[in-house]
Amino acid sequence: MSKRALISVSDKEGIVEFAKKIQELGWEIISTGGTKAVLDQEEIPNIAIDEVTGFPEMMDGRVKTLHPLIHGALLGRRDLDSHMKSLAEHHISPIDLVVVNLYPFKETLLAGGSQAEMIEKIDIGGPSMLRSAAKNHAAVTVVCDPMDYEKVEKELSADGETSLELRQQLAAKVFRHTASYDALIAQYLTEEFPVEDTKPEKLTLTYDLKQGMRYGENPQQSADFYESGLPTTYSIAQSHQLHGKELSYNNVRDADAALQIARDFDEPTVVALKHMNPCGIGTAKNIEQAWDYAYEADPVSIFGGIIVLNREVTEETAQKMSKIFLEIIIAPSYSKEALEILSKKKNIRLLTVDFSKKEQSEKEALVTGVLGGLLVQNQDVIVENPKEWTVATKVQPTDRQMEAMKFAWKAVKFVKSNGIIVTNDHQTLGVGPGQTNRVGSVKIALEATADKDALLQENAVLGSDAFFPFADNIDEIAKAGIKAIVQPGGSVRDQEVIEACDKYGIAMVFTGLRHFRH
C-alpha cells in the first residue's frame, strides 16, 4: 500500500517540484482547491479532497478538510491496535505526510485589507491539519514552510521515510508557526474590537528571527535579533544596510535610541549617540551645518558613535564625517558621491530608513523584559504646547531663551535619568546622564559645557528631565553662568528652588510634565 500525502498550500513556491518528487517515490497525493489546480496543470497525479471525504467543499471553501476521514487519518496512532482497528472499521487510510501553509493573513493586513477581507483570511482548516499532524509526529511528517521541502525530500529519497528527529523538529516548528499565526489574529481583533477601559487578560506577541548575533551585550552573552510580526517601517528592524559588517547587539540598541531622538525633529537634524545617550544634537537650515553643530557639541564622545541624519547625506557632509571613526550612519538616503566617500571606510555601517513613516512608529508599544514578566507602556511621544508652560520666577525668559528651552526639552527626554542637558537653540552643549543624584548629573553637564566657546554658551539654557529636589542644584547652575532653566516642577521644595533662581536672576519655566528615561 502506497503512502499518502495531503498537500494544501497558499504559497505555491516549490510545491510542484516537491510533489513531482514524492509522486516519483510512489506517494499518493491528496490535494485541495487551488493546489489541485496547480498540480493538474503540471499533470501530477492527485486526488481531490472531496473524493476522500465523500463530501463536497462548501461555503466558498470554508469547509473542506474538517472531516473525520481526514483528521482520523492524521491522528490515528500506528502503535495502538485500538486506533488501527478504528481506522479499519471506518475505512480510513492513514495519511503519512502533510504539507500545508496558511492563508496570507499577515500579508493581507500589511496590504491594508478591510475587516471583511481579514476575517476571510483567518485559516481554520489549515491550522487544524497542521496541529493534528504535529501531534502525531511519531508517525506523520508535517511541513509548514517551503524551506523544509528539500530536507524532507532528501530523507524520503534515501530511506523511504523521514527520521523521528526530523519529524520532531518539524512538529515543534508547526506549533511555533500556528501560535504566531493566531497571535497576529488576536492582536488584530483586539485592536479592531477593543473593550473600553480594560486591558487584555492575555498578551500575545509574535516576532520573527531577523538575525543571529555573534554575541550579546558582552561576548559571554548569546543574543538574537527578532522583528515584530507586524513590522514597523521606521525602525532599525526595517533598515536597509548599504555597506559594512552586520549589526551587533549594542549597535541595534544604540541605533534604535538614536532613531527615536531623530524622530522628534522636523528641521534638518543630526543626532550623535553613544551608549544609549545623545552626545550631540544639532539642527540647522541644512544638514551639513547640522552635522557641524552635532560634532562640535562633543568632538570627543562622538568618536565611535552612532549617527542619524534626517536628510539625505550630501557629498560635503560625507567628507566631514569620513574624517573620524563612526560605527553607524543612518539616513533616508545618500547622494552617489556621499556613498562613494563613506564606502571607502571598511568598518563603517551605512543604513537607510524610511523617514516618511516616522509618525506611525509612535503607536508601537514599548515592551521591556524583567525576570518573570514583561512591562508594556506607550511611548513618551506626547505633543506639548510651550504656550502652556509656566514661568515660575520673577525673571522672564527672553525669546531666544524660550527657543533654547524648546530645543532642550526635546533633547533631555532622551537622556538617561537623572538626565540633565545644556543647550542653546540649535545645539547641545553638555549632557549629564544617568547619575543617582540630580546634582551629580548637573555637574557633569556643566563641566562638559565649560570648555565651549563663550559665543556658543550665550543664551544657553539647562533642561532637567524631572524636578529639582533641592536648591543646591541651582547653586551649581548659577556658578556656571546659566541664566535659564526648563524643568517639570512638582517638588515639595519647588518654592525653595524658585527662590534660589530669583536670588541668582535665573529665569525658570515649569512644563508640568516629567520625562524619566531608564
UniProtKB/Swiss-Prot annotation:
Where does the MGS-like domain start and stop, copy by copy? 1-144
Keyword Manganese part of the UniProt annotation: no
Q: Which reaction does it catalyse?
A: (6R)-10-formyltetrahydrofolate + 5-amino-1-(5-phospho-beta-D-ribosyl)imidazole-4-carboxamide = 5-formamido-1-(5-phospho-D-ribosyl)imidazole-4-carboxamide + (6S)-5,6,7,8-tetrahydrofolate; IMP + H2O = 5-formamido-1-(5-phospho-D-ribosyl)imidazole-4-carboxamide
Q: Which GO terms describe its cellular component?
A: cytosol
Q: What is its EC number?
A: 2.1.2.3, 3.5.4.10
Signal sequence range: none
Establish whether keyword Signal is in the entry. Answer: no
Q: Which pathway, per its entry?
A: Purine metabolism; IMP biosynthesis via de novo pathway; 5-formamido-1-(5-phospho-D-ribosyl)imidazole-4-carboxamide from 5-amino-1-(5-phospho-D-ribosyl)imidazole-4-carboxamide (10-formyl THF route): step 1/1; Purine metabolism; IMP biosynthesis via de novo pathway; IMP from 5-formamido-1-(5-phospho-D-ribosyl)imidazole-4-carboxamide: step 1/1
Keywords recorded for this protein, A-Z? Hydrolase, Multifunctional enzyme, Purine biosynthesis, Transferase
Please, one GO biological process term?
'de novo' IMP biosynthetic process
Q: Which GO terms describe its molecular function?
A: IMP cyclohydrolase activity; phosphoribosylaminoimidazolecarboxamide formyltransferase activity
SUPFAM superfamilies with a match to the protein in the record: Cytidine deaminase-like (SSF53927), Methylglyoxal synthase-like (SSF52335)
Q: Which InterPro entries match?
A: AICAR_Tfase_dup_dom_sf, Cytidine_deaminase-like, MGS-like_dom, MGS-like_dom_sf, PurH-like
Family per record: Belongs to the PurH family.
Domain notes, please? The IMP cyclohydrolase activity resides in the N-terminal region.
Protein name as it appears in the record: Bifunctional purine biosynthesis protein PurH
- Chain's gene name: purH
